[in-house]
Amino acid sequence: APTLARFLQKNGYATGHFGKWHMGGQRNVADAPPISAYGFDQSLTNFEGMGPKLLPLTLKPGQNPEKPGRIWADATRLGNGVRWMQRSHITEGFVNEAIPFMEKEIAGNQPFYLNLWPDDVHSPFWPPTVKWGDGSKRRLYLSVLEAMDQQLGKLFAFVRKHPKLSGNTLIMVCSDNGPEKGAGVA
């Protein structure tokens, strides 16, 4: 099937995907094509997708930080390059990989397409423990939304400050999920 990344790659763009992946390599599919088969030169995903990934550790207030929970621990079978980090910092991990990807392509005068798919606002919500507040779904949602906004802000600041990108970059923002009962509405 045609993909935007594959089209751009064939037309000279460097392509990178950093974030959620739902196009093969799911929790129960160990033989899906790698993300590169969809047109991406570089990728870093979360629990799904073949290849390098950030896997989430979870903490609740009062939980022993030496014994965090693990979401989808068996996802390690889907590829090498697994790094574990707090769920509340996964988008930061994606942004911290996306910026060097852009820097490398800029240095080589290479046009690029960057796919950044954070999923912070997908339940269950795992903000930093200091941001749990009353623990209500609405509070947790707001906390993960604010954390995601901070990371997107870091990415946008990089684009704004870079002379080759400022005024020459198209940014599209879409949400991972629709309304979540109990999380509030805009």
Walk through the language-model features, giving the residues of each:
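Formylglycine-dependent sulfatase
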Residues: 1-186
